[in-house]
Amino acid sequence: MSGFGLAGPPPAPSIPGWTHLRTGKVRDLYTNNLNHILLVASDRISAYDWVMPTEIPGKGAVLTQLSLFWFDLLEDIIPNHVVSTDVPDEVEDRAIIVQPLEMFEIECVARGYLTGSGWSEYQQNSAVCGNALPAGLLDGSQLPTSIFTPATKADVGDHDINIDFNSAVKIIGADDAQTLKNLTIKLYETAAEFAQSRGIILADTKFEFGRNSEGEVLLGDEALTPDSSRFWDQSTWKPGGAQPSYDKQFLRDYLVASGWDRNSPPPELPDEIVEKSALRYEEAFFRITGSKF
């Protein structure tokens, strides 16, 4: 069991003029009579396939505003799904109006550094998702070149599974798989270069793509947030173990240390963990954009 636990997802807030479509781990989706989607980022936070029972104040706004920052920065590489930021007052700062997309059925992950599930796989076979890597790398090592490591898309409560490129081809076809691979690496390397100028290492990140009604491939979902990326402080980076980060790793580390059994619903988070998590999200926004949140 995982996801929202026995209580199920929280009730979606009622928003005049919008009809609720579905609730994800973090986002609530609505539609209107113009066939637009209202994408609302909540303050929910997930880890190890569970949605925590405690929210992180301001997190949804950070995710939305940081995504908008990156969407603007990367627009020359690929258009995105944003239609408008003129959203209802009830969800100000944490929602965007977007085009409906037919999403590709893979997660598009790029890695420039070895950590997380990539590190675990490398220890077993010196490769990550079919990308052969040199011997002697450590947890946190920079890779010789950026690699594409796709994953399957999982339902709420299920776990994404890393796959190789050939498996991605079987799911979405050779042409689309190559297109998404090229886009993913280009977006990652452009974003990583920008982040480096801010003293931040973008270790890895996940993108999602879809086609609009005209068949155009667009960047959807979110872009380069602490939920979809690993951000490390360049000044403290040292391969050989866990890196100080501006993302969910802090929460993951706490949960592991707490002794929580991942087969049971997670506990309420202590105030200290909530406050420190909120500060990490705000710090990520500031370090990347140069603006206080």
Segment roles from a protein language model:
Residues 142-174:
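A short mid-domain helix/strand-loop element embedded in enzyme catalytic domains
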Residues 172-203:
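A long amphipathic alpha-helix within ATP-dependent nucleotide-binding catalytic cores
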Residues 241-262:
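Short glycine/proline-rich, acidic loop/turn segments that cap or connect secondary-structure elements
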Residues 94, 195-212:
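A short glycine-rich, hydrophobically flanked beta-strand micro-motif that places a catalytic Asp/Glu
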Residues 36, 103-105, 199-202, 214-217, ...:
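Coil-to-beta-strand transition motifs
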Residues 26-30, 206, 214-216:
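Conserved beta-strand/loop block within the catalytic cores
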Residues 208-248:
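Catalytic activation segment of kinase domains across protein kinase-like and atypical kinase folds
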Residues 2-154, 261-268, 272-293:
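Active-site loop/lid in soluble adenylation, ligation, and acyl-transfer enzymes
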